[in-house]
């Protein structure tokens, strides 16, 4: 079912798709604009989040994002949604953007990723049950023309799909999970997508 073309939409499935699209866009909007109480309403009570700098519950994710206190807006492109009764998977293509000072030079980090949302319908309302990223590529460049040079050796220990993101998070004092999903590990990624499909089609209840 996952990655297959959706059947023609009925009125009910079209409304469900609109609700899910609104939910995932609003979750990122809330995160980008520090609307923590609003962000909290997007997650199911048993939600689990697994991204570069955080792994834990939805509630903990909101509190950790608040404590991080860093502006990192998301440029959202397109999203694809698959719905199966009370479960759904949405894949959002986005670029995570942030600026930070490295060696007194203002730098721009852009990280391209697919944000994977697994959603459940609870009492006629959709909630995020699980959120994870598939990392693709990133870049780190000076904001203004500069002779700033970072040694390639500094990036060799990082995964190519999120090397610059990992470098910046480490620079800011955050630990990074180096075993996340990324296009540089296609076999593991295919297994991950199969696992998602099993969950979506009710062949499995686990997403961890």
Predicted regions and their residues:
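Short, low-complexity N-terminal intrinsically disordered segments enriched in polar/charged residues
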Residues: 1-29, 33, 41
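Short beta-strand edge/turn micro-motifs at domain boundaries
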Residues: 89, 114-163, 173
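A hydrophobic membrane-anchoring alpha-helix module
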Residues: 150-208
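Short, cysteine-centered beta-strand-loop-beta hairpins and adjacent loop/turn segments enriched
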Residues: 97-109, 137-141
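A solvent-exposed, acidic/Ser-Thr-rich amphipathic alpha-helical stretch
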Residues: 36-98
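Outer-membrane beta-barrel proteins
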Residues: 15, 69, 105-107
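Short, surface-exposed coil-to-beta transition loops
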Residues: 74-76, 109-115
């Amino acid at each position: 079912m996952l990655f297959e073309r959706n059947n023609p939409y009925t009125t009910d499935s079209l409304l469900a798709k609109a609700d899910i699209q609104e939910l995932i866009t609003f979750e990122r909007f809330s995160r980008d604009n520090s609307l923590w109480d609003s962000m909290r309403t997007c997650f199911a009570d048993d939600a689990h989040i697994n991204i570069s700098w955080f792994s834990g519950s939805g509630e903990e994710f909101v509190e950790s994002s608040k404590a991080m206190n860093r502006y990192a807006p998301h440029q959202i492109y397109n999203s694809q949604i698959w719905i199966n009764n009370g479960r759904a998977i949405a894949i959002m293509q986005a670029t995570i953007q942030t600026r930070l000072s490295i060696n007194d030079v203002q730098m721009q980090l852009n990280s391209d990723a697919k944000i994977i949302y697994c959603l459940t319908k609870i009492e006629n309302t959709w909630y995020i049950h699980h959120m994870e990223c598939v990392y693709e590529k990133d870049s780190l460049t000076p904001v203004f023309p500069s002779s700033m040079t970072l040694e390639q050796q500094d990036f060799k220990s990082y995964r190519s799909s999120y090397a610059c993101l990992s470098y910046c998070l480490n620079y800011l004092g955050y630990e990074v999970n180096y075993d996340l999903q990324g296009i540089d590990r296609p076999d593991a990624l295919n297994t991950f997508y199969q696992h998602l499909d099993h969950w979506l089609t009710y062949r499995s209840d686990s997403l961890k």
